[in-house]
Structure formats: C-alpha cells, structure tokens
Design a protein with these regions (language model features):
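Phosphate- and other anionic-substrate recognition elements at nucleic-acid/protein interfaces
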Residues: 2-7, 14-141
Length: 141
C-alpha cells in the first residue's frame, strides 16, 4: 500500500525538480528546484532529507524515462547511481516511474502562465515532477 505524502524527484544533471502530494494522495504541487553543483548529489540528498522531514514524506517517486535511444542509456545509468545515494540517505520506499514527456507537458503548461522565459526555465523541473506525480496519483486512486 502506498503511503502519502509522496515526494516526486525529476533527476537532471544540472537541476533536480521536486514536487509533493497532499496527505490524501489527490493533488501534486511543484516544490523547488535543487541546483546540482560539481556533480555533488550527496548535497542534494541532504536537501531532500530536510524536505522529507519537514513534509513528513512517506514515499519517494523517482522519475525514470523510457530508453528510446542508445544515448539515453547514460542518463539512466546516472539516475540509477543517484537512486543508490538517495536510498542510503532517505530510508523510504522509492518507486520508479516513467516520466517520459513530463518536461514537454510542463513546458506547455508554463507557456500559459504569462511568466518570462527565465522564470519558466527556473520552474520547469519542479513542474515536470508535479506532472508525473499527478499522473501517478491519478492512476493509483
């Protein structure tokens, strides 16, 4: 049985987008974007731990895209390495979820917000995390 709230993580080599569900698992909302500095994912995991504690997170949803091209294999390998570091730190169940096209959907959504392109770019990763988290919530209710 899935426990709520869920923290969704949209992994990236430069940014990690975060989103969270409510305590009933009905609604996803974007949180923040963590900047990855010098490939230091342990620092990001420390930040994620703080968010987990503050929000009483019970489950992690880690976005993993489907592999369509050989070039994407390296991305998946990096996500798997990040997942190992994350698992050591958070000690919560981690569910892998296909987040393919979540960034494209998030870009479309943000176009209608009338924000500057710079502001949209700052939010894109957390909105993408919210997109695939909401898809997950909808499929599990």
């Amino acid at each position: 049985m899935i426990k709520y709230p869920i923290l969704a993580i949209d992994y990236g080599t430069k940014n990690i987008g975060l989103a969270i569900s409510d305590f009933k698992g009905l609604v996803a909302k974007p949180l923040e974007v963590l900047k990855v500095r010098n490939n230091n994912y342990k620092k990001c995991v420390e930040e994620i731990l703080k968010i987990v504690e503050c929000n009483k997170v019970q489950t992690i949803l880690l976005g993993k895209p489907q592999i369509f091209e050989i070039s994407q294999k390296k991305t998946l390998e990096k996500i798997n390495a990040f997942e190992k570091i994350l698992q050591e730190g958070v000690k919560l169940p981690i569910i892998n979820y296909d987040e393919s096209y979540s960034t494209v959907t998030a870009q479309d959504m943000l176009l209608y917000t009338r924000q500057t392109s710079k502001r949209r770019k700052e939010k894109i990763d957390s909105v993408a995390a919210a997109v695939f988290l909401q898809e997950f919530l909808n499929s599990n209710t």
